[in-house]
């Protein structure tokens, strides 16, 4: 399916293929993206704890790090944000592109726990891509996310619960409330920004 979308995109012209603009590298937005992804992971933890544990299939060594932290973010962002999101946005609009690209990104990760987390992370990455019009931003965020996940897995904490890591239920509740607040506020701001992007696309099409 992805190959078909790439083919269709090429036929329609390069304007809807992955955008790599250095102007989209906004440090504040990147920091927001990292914080939002971490908060999302904390908020989803009760749900993810009900799903099967994630197997450590990454391996170790330099090649594993390059594959997980460099190659995977690069190729996956080109495919899911650069091709799938852009193609869907051109035909069905901002919201459909945002949701569809995130859903497919989650589905292709297959494992239920990884798929749910990937869908949520995909929503953040999809928004950042449309907000910055640059894959560099999403590649960096994707690499940070994969790097954290890889480090957790190779150190034996890939399936550890936050409450076990902090060692205090009170501290866990405080962290969870903070993460939930960040998730709610950031999610609301993201939806408002997506509505503006939708309006901009509509005005551009009408011009």
Where are these regions (language model features)?
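Membrane-helix interface linkers and caps
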Residues: 1-31, 188-204
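Short, mixed-charge, low-aromatic patches
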Residues: 2-8, 38-45, 57-59, 82-84
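Transmembrane alpha-helix boundary signature
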Residues: 10-14, 41-52
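Surface-exposed beta-strand edges and their flanking turn/coil or helix-capping segments
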Residues: 17, 21, 31-35, 45, ...
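Helix-boundary and loop/linker segments of multi-pass membrane transporters
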Residues: 19-24, 53-60, 90-92
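Alpha-helical transmembrane segments
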Residues: 28-40, 183
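Transmembrane helix-loop-helix hairpins at the membrane interface
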Residues: 45, 62-206
């Amino acid at each position: 399916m992805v190959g078909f979308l790439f083919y269709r995109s090429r036929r329609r012209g390069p304007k809807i293929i992955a955008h790599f603009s250095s102007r989209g590298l906004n440090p504040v937005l990147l920091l927001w993206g990292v914080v939002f992804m971490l908060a999302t992971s904390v908020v989803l933890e009760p749900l993810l704890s009900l799903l099967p544990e994630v197997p450590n299939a990454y391996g170790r060594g330099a090649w594993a790090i390059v594959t997980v932290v460099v190659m995977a973010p690069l190729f996956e962002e080109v495919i899911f944000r650069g091709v799938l999101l852009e193609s869907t946005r051109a035909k069905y609009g901002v919201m459909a592109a945002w949701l569809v690209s995130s859903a497919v990104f989650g589905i292709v990760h297959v494992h239920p726990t990884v798929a749910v987390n990937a869908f949520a992370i995909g929503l953040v990455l999809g928004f950042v891509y449309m907000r910055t019009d640059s894959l560099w931003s999403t590649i960096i965020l994707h690499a940070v996310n994969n790097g954290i996940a890889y480090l957790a897995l190779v150190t034996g904490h890939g399936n550890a619960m936050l409450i076990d890591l902090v060692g205090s239920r009170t501290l866990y509740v405080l962290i969870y409330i903070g993460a939930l607040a960040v998730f709610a506020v950031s999610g609301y701001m993201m939806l408002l920004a997506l509505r503006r992007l939708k309006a901009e696309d509509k005005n551009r099409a009408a011009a």
